[in-house]
């Protein structure tokens, strides 16, 4: 039995050494070390040996098995290394070649416009305030001089969640909340950007959800001339230094007096074209002096403090600035549309 084990070892080691592929090595492993292999058969015949020979033959069989297994492992490692070298030699990489370009996204045009407006007002000493999109009826209407049953509420059909809770129809509630934090002491100088919601039918110029930026200044001795000067500066910064503005009388429950603000058409320079519908002017926002009732409900004495407020639709500003003819383009996630603003 001892000679048979040594003979099996010699045959196995010679075959392993001569093996030229991983498959051949695996076949040798199965042939000699498998459950039906000769070494296993030898171990099964140990019972026929005497009690004295059994330990000696058992130890020898295990040594032979271990040497064959080690030889197979070494051969596998060597063949795997050679196989990898051949694979790398056939797949040479030229590291001097330029890499594949990485697709780079662009900021959304609404983000570009919002950041531009925020930077403009921050440079004028304003701070940016935000508030909840799900608002109470009090802050969305009553605190803005729109009591229950007020006819002006029909101007903004709303998405109500409960009887006293709704999706805000404007960012004006942020102004009231901020004034309350000041506890009747000025100055207050803020802008408040954010989403607003109204029950409009979606079309080229209307959306049930859109972005709005409102501004508020409250301090002593604030006048209409302060509002006009601010809006003139904004128009020139946003649409060009040669722009002029005009104020038209209007009505908003939370301001008195109230105005609509137009800017000279940036396409025709005020001469009249299709963009301005031949008028030479384009409406950009609404504004006015803060109504005394709004100041009073927010904790300010209207005899001591005055203020002005303004609000603009971000989509409208972006449409005018970039010549976009349909508000729905902003929300369709069409990469062909958004990619045009990569450089913006």
UniProtKB/Swiss-Prot annotation:
Gene3D superfamilies associated with the record: Bira Bifunctional Protein, Domain 2
Annotated GO MF terms: ATP binding; catalytic activity, acting on a protein; magnesium ion binding; phenylalanine-tRNA ligase activity; transferase activity; tRNA binding
Reactions this protein catalyses: tRNA(Phe) + L-phenylalanine + ATP = L-phenylalanyl-tRNA(Phe) + AMP + diphosphate + H(+)
Main location: cytoplasm
EC numbers on record: 6.1.1.20
Amino-acid positions noted as binding Mg(2+) in the UniProt annotation, renumbered to this chain: 256
Cofactor note: Binds 2 magnesium ions per tetramer.
Keywords of this entry: Aminoacyl-tRNA synthetase, ATP-binding, Cytoplasm, Ligase, Magnesium, Metal-binding, Nucleotide-binding, Protein biosynthesis
GO CC terms in record: cytoplasm
UniProt subcellular location: Cytoplasm
Homology family: Belongs to the class-II aminoacyl-tRNA synthetase family. Phe-tRNA synthetase alpha subunit type 1 subfamily.
The protein's assembly and partners: Tetramer of two alpha and two beta subunits.
Identification of the protein by name: Phenylalanine--tRNA ligase alpha subunit
